[in-house]
Amino acid sequence: MKKMRLFSIFRHLIGVMALGVFSPWACASSSLPIDVEKSLTARQINREQLAVNVVDLDRSETILAWQADKSVVPASSVKIVTTLAALETLGPAFQWKTGFYHDGTIQKGVLKGNLYFVGGGDPRYVAEHLWRDVHTLKAMGFRQITGDIVVDRSLFATSQASAAIDGQNHRPYNLGADAALFNFNSVVIRFIPDERAGIAHVSALPLQTGIQLPKTVPLAAGWCSGWRSQLRADVSNPLKPTFKGTFVKGCGERQLTYVVSDREAYLSRSFSAQMKEAGIVWKGKVKSGLKTAKANMLFESASDDLATTVRLTNKFSNNILARHLFLSLALPQKASGVDYVDARAVMNRWLVDKVGIAPHVITVDNGSGLSRESQVTAGAMTKVLAYGARSPWSHEWISSFPIAGLDGTMKRRPMLEGSAHMKTGLLSGVKTMAGIVQASGGRRYAVFASLEGKNASQGDAVLDAILHWIASQN
């Protein structure tokens, strides 16, 4: 298929160099639509803070270009690049495999030796999967394990546990990549209000030994939007979270999630609880290590397929899924110790060889967008969108984007006409969007837009004005 060439149109020039290629584009507007200008003015955002590029996918024409070659931080909209590269590099049916091995002898249901839990990079190995796999051990005849559980995380380099960009290390969105990640290293506390009794019932998942929770917290009047602050939760001790406030009356069930920093202790408590529930005696400990050469495989546990992970990554802007997808780009070339340098090399080759984007025009730092080191241009991002729209996996990819007014991060941003599959991005001082719009006349358009600087956080209306302008095209 002939490659489409993208070019930005400057205010005073037509047919300038973009992405290292020349091409004449017809019908491109180098001024902003009136409603977009009005929205910028109303929110006191300078027009120079905006970068936008819009391409008619049916005609391969740029219809709007404003600072389309300006390098900007994409925030989470870069996930569309990560997910498309993963679909094309690994395929939509790719699965991660978590391995269970042992290094001892098995006699009458007793394993005299260690059990190995070998991470295969599955970002969604959660409590239900551990329950299933422990019960698989039970079904295989295991009654007791005398040794330890050794967790092998060597598929990914240990350095991938990155520091939080905002200092909020206890928040799940800041979780670093881990080849043997379990349940996002998170505890989910559930609050179920009982209006008649004036209390909310409290419970926690996953099932763990040693965790202490109050059974209830009192209800009180308040604002639903401020339920967290009114609860006054303290999770500094992950085994004994406390709630010094009250739960807001009339707000329905809510969940509070926090990350446990000690991975081994978290997994140990989870294994202990699941082993006890399944009737397997185990009194050892969980420790990090490498699977020995003499270890024998018991079974492998397969993840969801990659297409499912892509959907969850984009619909809900899940950072840890994106990081695992990004690192997994290098798995066909490297069997262990995969790091972001390896992933960036694969990504850069794919962008150059497949998409036709010159080196360093798009820089992906960790795959998630939760980084100010990632850089893109509006023109390059619409080129990725145009390429992806022609990919054999275009359906899996585009359908993973949030739909305006319907789901994901675009649920509360409906379209007045037409429709949009749109991935958004947000960092302090940065707001972006990237996706596909189907206009009321039936044509499809690729769009990337970015706002940076003062009042960028107030820019939803500006980006929506761009979407509505595109949707009104014939």
Task: Name every feature range the model reports, one short phrase each.
Residues 63-66, 316, 326-474:
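Small-residue-rich helix-loop
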Residues 26-71, 131, 136-140:
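Beta-lactamase-like hydrolase cores
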